[in-house]
Amino acid sequence: EMLKGIAEGAKETRSPAIVSVSEGAFAYTDENFVKGLYESARKSYKDVPLFLHLDHGKSFEMCKKAVDLNFDSVMIDGSALPFEENVLVTKKVVDYAHAHGVLVEAELGVLRGIEDNVSAEKNVYTNPESAEEFVRRTGCDTLAVAIGTSHGAYKFSGEATLRFDILSEIEKRLPNYPLVLHGASSVPQKYVEVINKFGGEVTGAKGVDENLLKKACREHNIFKINTDTDLRLAYISTVRKHLAKNPNNIDLRKFNTLAIEEIKNLVADKNRCFNNINRI
């Protein structure tokens, strides 16, 4: 359902899409199912460039598995490791992935919050000088940076702010280098309200202001923005509302069709917000 909604949204705005698969997704199903689902989507949406990406690979072995499955790109997340260990594991992944024509995203700095297999209690902002050294020594193709975003639906207790001063300093040291923002869901309140109204409990959920995200991708070198939480909220709010109003329904296709449509609309809106339209 998620994949179909993403592909439909990308088709509507004539945009390429990066479809991220987490270690949790591999644990939930299996590698053959993941690969088969993606290959089927590419056949069904031949006019939409869909790129398969491993999100938050925690080890060389996990990244190697994704490379061997012909993923287009992998992320090695050594952000919780000491700097030198992060460099070593990232360089090992880069060497293997590049030999197979696969791009590598790495991460430096720590994002607070919980999402899938990623958990941290506080933010550790990316050090610009360390970022420059890290990219030079590892040869990673993109770098996820920590400038104030966080994983999950509860990103800010007060005013939502991002450290654009840190981002600008990183860009001075890495001119024209593609950077990534994780934990950048805006947590639309319309979804939060529907979930809470129909039996859920996500009170206090708060995301990143979309105006800040617009600035990040339109005025800075942020080329990839991760918004998984928003997709989850779109799906869950639609399903909860439908089942509450149709308690006798046992046909999954009825509420999944509605959820796919909502995901499609959300993805299309994100593409417009991030100026990712008419690119194919």
Can you say where each PLM-predicted feature lies in the sequence?
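Generic long, charged, amphipathic alpha-helical segments
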Residues: 180-183
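Shared catalytic-loop signature of beta/alpha-barrel
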Residues: 19, 26-30, 213-214, 223-246, ...
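Extended, intrinsically disordered, low-complexity segments
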Residues: 237-280
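Hydrophobic alpha-helical scaffolding
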Residues: 27, 124, 202-206, 225, ...
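Alpha/beta enzyme core
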Residues: 1-25, 32-47, 51, 56-178, ...
